[in-house]
Amino acid sequence: MRLQSLFASALTLGSCVAQNSTNGTWPIHNNGLTTQIEWDHYSMIVNGQRFFLWSGELHYWRIPVPELWVDVLQKIKAAGFNTFAIYTHWYFHNPNPETLDFENAAHDFTKIFDLAKELGMYVVFRPGPYVNAESNAGAFPLWLTTGAYGSLRNNDTRYTEAWTPFWEKVASIVAPYQLTNGGNVLTYQIENELGSQWRGTPSKKIPNLSSIQYMEALEASARAQGITIPFQANDPNLNSDSWSKDFYDGYGSVDIYGMDSYPACWTCNLTECDSTNGAYKPFNVIDYYDHFQEISPTQPSFLPEFQGGSFNPWGGPEGGCPENSPADFANLFYRNNVGQRVTAMSLYMLYGGTNWGWLAAPVVATSYDYSSPISENRMINDKYAETKLFGQFLRVAKDLTKTDRIGTNQTASTNPNIVYSEIRNPDTNGAFYVTIHQESTVGTREEFYINANTSKGEFTIPQKAAPIVLNGFQSKIIVTDFSFGSHSLLYSTAEVLSHSIVDEEDILALWMPTGEAGEFVVTGAKSGKVSSCGGCSSVGFYPQGDDLLVTISQSEGISILTFDDGLRVLVMDRSYAYEFWVPVLTADPFSPANETVFVQGPSLVRSVAYSSDGTILELTGDNNGTSTQIEVFPPKAVSEVTWNGQSIKTSKTDYGSLIGSLTAPALDSLTLPEISGWKANDSLPERLSTYDDSWWVDANHMNTSNPTKPETLPVLYIDDYGYHVGNHLWRGRFEGSASGVYLSVTGGRAFGYSAWLNGEFIGSYVGAAYPDTGELTLSFGNLASSNSTNILLVLQDNSGHDETSGALNPRGINNATLISSSAKNFTSWKVTGTAGKPDTAIDPVRGILSEGGLYAERLGWHLPGFDDSEWSSASPSNISSSAGVTFYRTTVPLAIPTGLDVAISFTLNASPSNAALRALLFVNGYQYGRFSPWIGNQIEFPVPPGILNYDGDNVIGLSVWRQEEGGESMGVDVGWKITEAFASSFEPIFDATYLQPGWTEERLQYA
């Protein structure tokens, strides 16, 4: 019946919407449930206004401290974004088939919706159920990975029954927060990068019914739970052409089509992207225009994931690869997208966060910094500042929301090395000339002019100033007929930064790279003057008919030009533009210009408000200098400025601004106490033959649902026994005098394992960055007993489940074969892992992904409140020469002064630097670092407030698994440091007790 209805709908709806508009107009679409959110060929239309969706991604589950969400979101808003995107995480909320958790601590994500409303941003909500995200099994619940639910992401009824409770609950939670219900959730994504609508070549449109029926079921379920906002989808690349109603109106297609792109590769291992992008070339731009014209011509060109950075795989470069997508990348690629008529774009990632616990897929380690504009430690960087310049421009460039592409790759009039795309608003005639190098991979310094068509004719610009310059891997957007408030620019070769209306008068901000020249024409102006020259030169005012042509060169600083009609124009270089802010007085995501204030100088401006009588301008934000100049451009009624609640002394300038100075403590004098006072205990008693494993799970399955069958029996796949993350322990028994064992163990990239027979170490697979399986033939020597039961312990690491179809790839022992044995096989196996019943978290606050199965973890040695008074003193700097696991623990107080936001990172340094060991860092019960110096890539581990107590005691734990016996001494030096500090209105000191549940006697049963 379902199949019949599918084909019936397809026949009724037809196959493809015409790609060209009729009668010069494009149809305006909605989903039939609301007209609050509509769209057409040009852009989205929200509450009747055209809208450039400018968004960035963050994951609340990668920053599991709800008190920190406001900090990150304030920084997103301050950079000019009007939207942010979030994934949910199925496993984080659904630890077993019977349990859904949307209440405990960070599991309750509704605070994010409240903050979006308060700050004035829309939300692109992406609930999966599969999300990828370099997360363990792509965020599938790991109980789903046994094969018992089929191959996943299809119409298999077993899989449908698995996702339905989670999917329905999420939709019911989100429904009240939709724009249509007074909230700010704008769109709702169905699945993630599921480019499988078609079988074979997409142009043949042979339906893939399994995927189609899956998508239709997800859509119907969400609608049944009250989701009325538009559905969106994100095609994984340019090749799969899936889920656009323009390409095929039916077969599960969604309301708004999108396509993801990572032109500089999503990983620091650039070869992984060759099959998608071709061989890597730095700064090689990609054409999207033709794709969107073919696949979604009556919809806005939408990039739901556009590169904000890239993740760092195991063995990658220390600190990631920010050089692959630096500030210049943001400058060039985001502008180039505008030149291709993209009017909806979300950066992945804008804030990456941390793969704490066992959140990560095997492709990535603890850090998920992603070289993002907002770093893992929540601090902003040069890429953030460069992105902010673009975002502030988008906020005021209203004509961008409706443009036609007039020409592309047009050569600059004087330099064939520069080309530009011209896009023009058909209603206002406002145009944007997006300039780039003819070969974007070439970053030479080039001077050029362009032929610009304006409402007053064609001009070769600039007319009087020095030529336009592209210096490096950059782009510039040259505007013509640019309207702002009651004014307009006929053109400008200096880039537009922002626009504010104060006391019903316009203030325009322009910027240019340090030392370059710009030229602009103010329509209707008769005269102008330099009211303040902060680094300006070659300033000229030239009447041109009814208009005024202005030339200026700008070194480091900010200059203010005033005009006879009341217009003020701020011209600044890049360095000053980086510290130029446009806070908004309203919670309207459109950020109207008459609700903004210009502020220059601080490291960050978080908010702005007026006192009730309008005489005090109240600013909050961050600054990091002992003396930082601040200049604000408020209404005339303002006579006082406060910064973070404190009045600052200001003086008024002739051109209407107020200038003052911000002070901050001497932040470079901040210090942290030494991490010392370590105590230690053996964390691997399971290696001993006397250890009692009677409570462990019997690993006795003789068959498995997993499509990959083991080479020996019983089945020793960890997920089949209800354990899924971290370290697992297998104990196999046999009788007789075997001489050795062959082991084949799978644990994902960068995993490892070690083995002991009757308490004695026999060998390790130390691991490598890419292999996910390790094979060893281990000799027992004279350790096996022919007269008693022998016990083999295998301690296995598990770096996570693979993504997409690889989620079913098993983890565990594929083959355990005794060698030269009088017994043919092991007589029995037992297994244990994370404390709690299988598939059940003992710690619902930190959640199912927080800890693995080490003895120390099971017994809660990493938790606050555990009594270590009987332990002996020992330092991880000099560990035992025996292979095994030792747990180290200490308590260190912190006393960060109030009024400061401080980023703290732990440092782990091995001796020797490539030591064959594996260490886990725990902070107040949270695992915040996986350290494998043999494999490499990370020695600094940021830990945020809320995990760390900034004003109180901190329990720090370190498990050290030595994988080699004897030889040179080994150790791990544990330190910490302040990486950045600011005087801030954000207060990182708060009561985090609820996030840090302590030790309980319940743990003792897992000894």
UniProtKB/Swiss-Prot annotation:
Q: Point out the glycosylated residues in this chain.
A: 20, 23, 155, 208, 269, 409, 453, 594, 624, 681, 703, 787, 815, 825, 878
Q: Which GO terms describe its biological process?
A: polysaccharide catabolic process
UniProt-recorded Gene Ontology molecular function terms: beta-galactosidase activity
Its main localization is secreted
One GO cellular component term of this record is: extracellular region
Which residues of this protein are catalytic?
A: E193 (proton donor), E305 (nucleophile)
Q: What is its EC number?
A: 3.2.1.23
Annotated S-S bridges: C268-C321
Under catalytic activity, the entry for this protein gives: Hydrolysis of terminal non-reducing beta-D-galactose residues in beta-D-galactosides
The cross-references to Pfam families, in alphabetical order and at most eight, read: BetaGal_ABD2 (PF13364), BetaGal_dom2 (PF10435), BetaGal_dom3 (PF13363), Glyco_hydro_35 (PF01301)
Instruction: Say yes or no: keyword Signal present.
Output: yes
Q: Which residues form the signal peptide?
A: 1-18
Q: What does this protein do?
A: Cleaves beta-linked terminal galactosyl residues from gangliosides, glycoproteins, and glycosaminoglycans.
Matching PANTHER family: BETA-GALACTOSIDASE RELATED
The record's family statement is: Belongs to the glycosyl hydrolase 35 family.
Q: What is this protein called?
A: Probable beta-galactosidase B
> What organism, scientifically named, is this protein from?
Botryotinia fuckeliana (strain B05.10)
